[in-house]
């Protein structure tokens, strides 16, 4: 103890009885040292204060980041919705092209199948219809109507139609492949959207649980409305912790002063304050260097204190010592609350970032599709439309040609039945002509015989009286009438169509040795003798066609 301290002690020693009772209540140096050690230990709470400052700074940064990211997410989401609507609109239009093309193509194929079936049926009827032998040269192999038809036109038409169908099928296959790839792209986007919705739902539920704001119920995007109030709460906690730490520092300074003013306490104070808790000498973290202040207080010269001032200081020290532990506990409670709030803020920030990342993932899928492959999918639809329009025109032309061929061949069948009826009609007319000829010949023969007999009777009765040269014809037989068959020439209409064909010349009368009315002679045209059943069948078929036509 120094001389000045001794003189000071001795000067306050003689007091009355009351003063001595007060002096006996002053704690011993060991008690003051224990309070100093406890005060020094309480200063470790400065780490909580530093942590509180870090939390406030980080939370403010997280809030700023969340606001920026949330704004970006909202902007992207608006663009995303527009892009999705446009994308699905394009897919719907491409699908409409495909569906319409398939429907039209299927309808055309059905029409082609029906036309081809009709043509095949007609061709089969031509094969089944055998030309009656009386129409053909004697000894010729039997022929059907199909033998008179050149099917090369049908084959060429079918080949052209097959090529058009193959090209349409190829274009349709390419479109279907393109649409499947488009659907795969959309499925990938749907999966990204599913992840986006799951992340958004989780983020919204997290923010809803941490915020009582009505906007937290909006499940579209996580709400940040509760973060400013939480940041304000962190700032209030940090400020209050700084104030509490300041009170602990004042208590520590008071303990140091009390120990130094106590006999033998100077060395103890220097020894105790020689190794301050970690963080006391950290500068540049937003607060003063507390250790420098403590060292300045420790090394400062002692101001003289009266006994009453000393006792008052000690009483304040003891009172503060009883509350120091509560202050430390309050700092710990506040830092714990701040950590919880900070974790909540970081969780909301992470939720916003997760939604942003999920949004950008969907946007990247759409951007990649739109920039690299969407134009190809649209172009494929246009290519199919162009090919189908061209081939549709070709197929329609082929369909018309098939119908014309069927009409032609069906007309051939009908014409053959008409030919049978025409032959039957001509034979009937020939029979009538022959009957007229027979009747006329019979009457002419009768007239001839009557005339001969009359002439002979006249000659017998009057011949002796008439000179022979009075009329040379008096002794001639009567004129005879002969019928001659002349081969028919070409009809006038046929001559107009084929002017180069020579018509058959009429038979020379000198070539006819014996003219007769026999209908089986070869002079003139030859009319086949057709069975009655064949004629009746042809007539029945013609009537059936007429009923179908009406």
Swiss-Prot record:
Compositional bias per record (Basic and acidic residues), positions renumbered to this chain: 508-519
Coiled coil spans: 315-344, 427-457
GO CC list: Atg1/ULK1 kinase complex; phagophore assembly site membrane
GO BP: any one term: autophagy of mitochondrion
UniProt gene name: atg17
PANTHER family: AUTOPHAGY-RELATED PROTEIN 17
One matching Pfam family: ATG17_like
Source organism: Aspergillus terreus (strain NIH 2624 / FGSC A1156)
Principal subcellular localisation of the protein: cytoplasm
Function of the protein: Autophagy-specific protein that functions in response to autophagy-inducing signals as a scaffold to recruit other ATG proteins to organize pre-autophagosomal structure (PAS) formation. Modulates the timing and magnitude of the autophagy response, such as the size of the sequestering vesicles. Plays particularly a role in pexophagy and nucleophagy.
Alphabetic keyword roster: Autophagy, Coiled coil, Cytoplasm, Membrane
Family named by the database record: Belongs to the ATG17 family.
Superkingdom classification of source: Eukaryota
Keyword Cytoplasm listed: yes
InterPro entries: Atg17, ATG17-like_dom
Cell compartments where the protein resides: Cytoplasm; Preautophagosomal structure membrane
Biased amino acid composition, Low complexity: 1-13
Phylogenetic placement of the source organism: Eukaryota, Fungi, Dikarya, Ascomycota, Pezizomycotina
Name of the protein this chain belongs to: Autophagy-related protein 17
């Amino acid at each position: 103890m120094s001389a000045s301290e001794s003189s000071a002690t001795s000067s306050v020693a003689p007091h009355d009885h009351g003063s001595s009772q007060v002096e006996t209540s002053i704690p011993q140096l060991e008690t003051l040292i224990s309070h100093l050690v406890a005060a020094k230990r309480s200063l470790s709470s400065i780490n909580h204060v530093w942590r509180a400052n870090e939390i406030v700074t980080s939370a403010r940064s997280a809030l700023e980041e969340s606001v920026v990211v949330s704004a970006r997410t909202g902007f992207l989401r608006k663009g995303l919705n527009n892009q999705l609507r446009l994308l699905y609109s394009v897919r719907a239009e491409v699908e409409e092209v495909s569906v319409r093309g398939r429907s039209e193509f299927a309808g055309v194929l059905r029409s082609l199948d029906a036309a081809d079936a009709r043509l095949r049926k007609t061709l089969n009827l031509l094969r089944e219809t055998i030309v009656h032998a009386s129409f053909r040269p004697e000894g010729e192999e039997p022929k059907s109507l199909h033998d008179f038809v050149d099917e090369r036109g049908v084959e060429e038409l079918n080949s052209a139609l097959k090529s058009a169908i193959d090209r349409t099928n190829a274009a349709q296959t390419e479109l279907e492949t393109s649409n499947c790839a488009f659907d795969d792209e959309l499925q990938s986007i749907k999966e990204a959207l599913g992840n986006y919705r799951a992340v958004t739902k989780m983020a919204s539920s997290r923010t809803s649980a941490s915020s009582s704001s009505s906007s937290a119920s909006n499940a579209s995007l996580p709400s940040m409305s509760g973060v400013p109030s939480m940041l304000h709460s962190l700032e209030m906690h940090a400020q209050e912790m700084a104030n509490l730490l300041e009170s602990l520092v004042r208590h520590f300074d008071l303990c140091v002063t009390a120990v130094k003013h106590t006999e033998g306490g100077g060395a103890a104070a220097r020894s105790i304050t020689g190794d301050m808790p970690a963080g006391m000498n950290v500068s540049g973290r937003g607060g003063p260097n507390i250790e420098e202040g403590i060292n300045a207080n420790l090394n400062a010269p002692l101001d003289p204190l009266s006994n009453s001032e000393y006792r008052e200081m000690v009483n304040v020290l003891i009172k503060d010592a009883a509350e120091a532990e509560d202050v430390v506990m309050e700092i710990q409670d506040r830092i714990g609350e701040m950590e919880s709030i900070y974790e909540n803020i970081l969780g909301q920030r992470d939720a916003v970032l997760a939604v942003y990342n999920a949004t950008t993932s969907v946007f990247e899928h759409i951007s990649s599709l739109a920039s690299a492959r969407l134009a190809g999918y649209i172009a494929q639809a246009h290519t199919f439309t162009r090919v189908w329009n061209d081939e549709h025109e070709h197929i329609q032309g082929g369909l018309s040609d098939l119908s014309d061929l069927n009409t032609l061949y069906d007309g051939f069948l009908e014409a053959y039945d008409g030919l049978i009826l025409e032959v039957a009609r001509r034979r009937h007319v020939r029979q009538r002509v022959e009957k007229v000829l027979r009747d006329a010949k019979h009457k002419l023969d009768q007239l001839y015989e009557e005339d001969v007999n009359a002439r002979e009777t006249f000659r017998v009765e009057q011949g002796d009286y008439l000179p022979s040269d009075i009329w040379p014809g008096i002794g001639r037989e009567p004129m005879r009438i002969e019928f001659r068959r002349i081969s028919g020439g070409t009809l006038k209409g046929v001559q107009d169509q084929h002017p180069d064909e020579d018509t058959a010349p009429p038979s020379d009368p000198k070539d006819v040795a014996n003219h007769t009315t026999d209908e089986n002679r070869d002079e003139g045209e030859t009319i086949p003798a057709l069975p009655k059943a064949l004629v009746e069948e042809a007539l029945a078929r013609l009537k059936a066609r007429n009923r179908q036509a009406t």
